Amino acid sequence: MTVVVISGPPGSGKSTVAKKLASELGLRFVSAGSVFRKLAEEIGVSLLELNEMALKDPEIDLRIDRMVLEEARRGNVVIEAHLGGWVAAPYADVNVYLTAPLEERAKRIARRDGISYEEALEEILSREEVQWIRFRKLYGFDVASLEIFDLVVNTALMGPEAVVETIKRMLL
């Protein structure tokens, strides 16, 4: 019942690594970020607007947390979730945090979303500011504290293939 949780800020490579790892290990892939993006689309707001709405309505985050926990309990899954490392830690065989310098993350998001570097940078800074406030208020923890993770990787220094191989070795 393997459970790998991959957390990190926007643009850190969570989805890329999680999808590749799930594929190579024959595990299910679950993305809390995709659920959050889908919810924003469904109600017709931007990610930043949904983040701001979640400040006032904790049920938005709790709904995603319940989904992450249920998937972790089912096992045989790679979960990609900004807060997954904190929420699903008791179920994780390997708890991974990916990061990269802000400039690199902005370049990745600009490429992924087809927006300018400046727009991506502004989006990241706005989202992270709201998220940090929201997460501290709702959960009482500091997302900058990484002690709970088994592996912390700067993905600007290590590509997705190397990260996947490192995680696979940790599962042996």
From Swiss-Prot:
GO terms for cellular component: cytoplasm. It catalyses: CMP + ATP = CDP + ADP; dCMP + ATP = dCDP + ADP. GO terms for biological process: pyrimidine nucleotide metabolic process. Disulfide bonds: none annotated. CDD domains: CMPK (cd02020). ATP binds at residues 8-16. Its main location: cytoplasm. Keywords: ATP-binding, Cytoplasm, Kinase, Nucleotide-binding, Transferase. GO terms for molecular function: ATP binding; CMP kinase activity; dCMP kinase activity. It is an enzyme of class 2 (transferase). It is found in: Cytoplasm. It holds the Pfam family Cytidylate_kin2. NCBIfam families: cyt_kin_arch (TIGR02173). Belongs to the cytidylate kinase family. Type 2 subfamily. This is Cytidylate kinase.
